[in-house]
């Protein structure tokens, strides 16, 4: 019996030893020498880095940092850009911080830099029409600015400038070595730029963008150093506080698992450094692209915004100049310009004194050069589009359709430019046709007969009528246009009469002119006045 128990112990001991030996080999091939978790994470399937980002060894350090003292929204998902709500007209501090490492950019040590703060559109589809959007806002809010600088509250800023032609930008100089804070006020609200305004619309987002420049060798602040921006929405006074509270209450109702997908609300908003790329295409290239496809994809602007593109400054700053409006550019041409200012004495916008059309003088010709096209734009009050059409000749401009011009210039200016290109005049309120009889030197008599024929005079020659276009339906306008068309000195015309029944003469009054039928035909003659050296005109 003892032998049997001993054999059982030996067998059990052997089994345990064999089992331990078999377990000891598991995982040996997965040791540190053969397997590394970092190598697995480096595989392409796990790697989702943006190829445009710098590698760890060459991480760029931004020279400046801008912090806006306004809380971010808690209703923004983790990987989305922060969103900050602002109240219209309220002052918000932007702290301008020197973030350079020791030895970085020694050329600006002890020197001032210039920063331009702007409010721009976040959506690229609105950026394409930014000029027209801002012009429309200016029209509805005359005398107001989209962005202002609260100078009394600001600290460390020097020589602030605002240009009347750039209502969405302010600029100033500052010393990076000193404490600097700029207080800004945004006066436009997000719902002012929504296409349909019936109440309850979702307002469009804006961006607060800061661009900083240093001096070049000529002392001009043109060398770009840094740009950063953040996304905002602007509400009517106290509206931002209510929206922030609403977002916070919505987040409190979410489960803990859902909250993990959202960013926390931060007390301040850090403007994110962004790369510069041309967010607004060259106008010509853009129009050429639109010729085959008129609309942009619905997510086009949003996808670009998420990638972190930065809007270029309006005009590359060339010098730190005062904010007085710059004079309109002038152009010289070796040839005589094909455009001319309309004659103020013409009987209609398209007619000279003799009735000949002067359309050829006003209308831009297909052969017009680029310089002549620029002159034509200036003379026809399209100076704000001279830069947009800087490479357009007369033929290029005339090829644009009405729809093209409306998309480029907006509805109001687009239609006006189209009408100017097609030389469309204002439709006259009244048109009459007048033919002159042989002048008579007899004294005004009570009985005069009308011409025997409406188409021929006594010699059988056909009557030739001239068109008189009346923009004002008054008697003095009739006298002025008759004098202009038939080369009669206006001061010599005493009265204008209309021959009535039985040959009586009726004084032409404003009320009579207003009752003229459109395209009426008249013969007229002149007789000497009895009491002066003037003449009377008789319409028959």
Swiss-Prot record:
Start and end residues of each stretch annotated as Disordered: 236-270, 285-368
Compositionally skewed regions (Basic and acidic residues) per UniProt: 238-262
The keyword Amino-acid biosynthesis is annotated on this UniProt entry: no
GO MF: DNA-binding transcription activator activity, RNA polymerase II-specific; DNA-binding transcription factor activity, RNA polymerase II-specific; RNA polymerase II cis-regulatory region sequence-specific DNA binding; sequence-specific double-stranded DNA binding
Modified residues annotated as Phosphoserine in this record: 22, 390, 393
Annotated GO biological process: angiogenesis; negative regulation of viral transcription; positive regulation of transcription by RNA polymerase II; regulation of transcription by RNA polymerase II
PROSITE patterns found in the cross-reference section: GRH_CP2_DB
Biased composition (Polar residues): 320-368
Record keywords, A-Z: DNA-binding, Nucleus, Phosphoprotein, Transcription, Transcription regulation
Inducing or repressing factors: By HIV-1 infection of lymphocytes.
GO cellular component, one term: nucleus
Cell compartments where the protein resides: Nucleus
Alphabetical list of InterPro entries matching this protein: CP2 (IPR007604), SAM/pointed_sf (IPR013761), SAM_3 (IPR041418), TF_CP2-like (IPR040167), Ubp1_SAM (IPR037600)
Tissue occurrence: Expressed in adrenal tissue, JEG-3, NCI-H295A, Hep-G2 and HeLa cell lines.
Ranges for domain Grh/CP2 DB: 60-296
SUBUNIT field: Interacts with TFCP2. Interacts with PIAS1, and is probably part of a complex containing TFCP2, UBP1 and PIAS1.
Known role: Functions as a transcriptional activator in a promoter context-dependent manner. Modulates the placental expression of CYP11A1. Involved in regulation of the alpha-globin gene in erythroid cells. Activation of the alpha-globin promoter in erythroid cells is via synergistic interaction with TFCP2. Involved in regulation of the alpha-globin gene in erythroid cells. Binds strongly to sequences around the HIV-1 initiation site and weakly over the TATA-box. Represses HIV-1 transcription by inhibiting the binding of TFIID to the TATA-box.
Family label: Belongs to the grh/CP2 family. CP2 subfamily.
Listed name of the protein: Upstream-binding protein 1
Organism: Homo sapiens
Lineage: Eukaryota, Metazoa, Chordata, Craniata, Vertebrata
């Amino acid at each position: 019996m003892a032998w049997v128990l001993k054999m059982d112990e030996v067998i059990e001991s052997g089994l345990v030893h064999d089992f331990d030996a078999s377990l000891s080999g598991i995982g040996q091939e997965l040791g540190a020498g053969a397997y590394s978790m970092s190598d697995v994470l480096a595989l392409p399937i796990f790697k989702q880095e943006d190829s445009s980002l710098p590698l760890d060894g060459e991480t760029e350090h931004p020279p400046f940092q801008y912090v806006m003292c306004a809380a971010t929204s808690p209703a923004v998902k983790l990987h989305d850009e922060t969103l900050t709500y602002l109240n219209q007209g309220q002052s918000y501090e932007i702290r301008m911080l020197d973030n350079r490492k020791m030895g970085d950019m020694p050329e600006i040590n002890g020197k001032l830099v210039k920063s331009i703060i702007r409010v721009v559109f976040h959506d690229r589809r609105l950026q394409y029409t930014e000029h027209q959007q801002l012009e429309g806002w200016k029209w509805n809010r005359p005398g107001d600015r989209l962005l202002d600088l609260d100078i009394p509250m600001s600290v460390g800023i020097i020589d602030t400038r605002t240009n009347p032609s750039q209502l969405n930008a302010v600029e100033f100089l500052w010393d990076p070595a000193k404490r600097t804070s700029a207080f800004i006020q945004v006066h436009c609200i997000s719902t002012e730029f929504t296409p349909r305004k019936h109440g309850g619309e979702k307002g469009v987002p804006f961006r607060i963008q800061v661009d900083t420049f240093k001096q070049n060798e000529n002392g001009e602040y043109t060398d770009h150093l840094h740009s950063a921006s953040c996304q905002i929405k602007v509400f009517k006074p106290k509206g931002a506080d209510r929206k922030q509270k609403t977002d916070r209450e919505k987040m409190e109702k979410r489960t803990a698992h859902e909250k993990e997908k959202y960013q926390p609300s931060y007390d301040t908003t850090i403007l994110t450094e962004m790369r510069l790329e041309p967010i607004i295409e060259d106008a010509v290239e853009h129009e050429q692209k639109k010729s085959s496809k008129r609309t942009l994809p619905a997510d086009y602007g949003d996808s670009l915004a998420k990638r972190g593109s930065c809007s270029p400054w309006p005009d590359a700053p060339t010098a730190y100049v005062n904010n007085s409006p710059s004079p309109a550019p002038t152009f010289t041409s070796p040839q005589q310009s094909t455009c001319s200012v309309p004659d103020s004495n013409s009987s209609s916008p398209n007619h000279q004194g003799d009735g000949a059309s002067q359309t050829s003088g006003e209308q831009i010709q297909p052969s017009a050069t680029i310089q002549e096209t620029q002159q034509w734009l200036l003379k026809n009050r399209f100076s704000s589009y001279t830069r947009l059409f800087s490479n357009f000749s007369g033929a290029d401009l005339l090829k644009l359709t009405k729809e093209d011009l409306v998309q480029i210039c907006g509805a109001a200016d687009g239609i006006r430019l189209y009408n100017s290109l097609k030389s469309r005049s204002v439709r006259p309120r009244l048109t009459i046709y007048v033919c002159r009889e042989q002048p008579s030197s007899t004294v005004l008599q009570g009985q005069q007969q009308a011409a025997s024929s409406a188409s021929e005079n006594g010699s059988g020659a056909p009557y030739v009528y001239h068109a008189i276009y009346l923009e004002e339906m008054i008697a003095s306008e009739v006298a002025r246009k008759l004098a202009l068309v038939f080369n009669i000195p206006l001061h010599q015309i005493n009265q204008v009469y209309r021959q009535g029944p039985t040959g009586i003469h009726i004084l032409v009054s404003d009320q009579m002119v207003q009752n003229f039928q459109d395209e009426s035909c008249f013969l007229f003659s002149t007789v000497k006045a009895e009491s002066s050296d003037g003449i009377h005109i008789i319409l028959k």
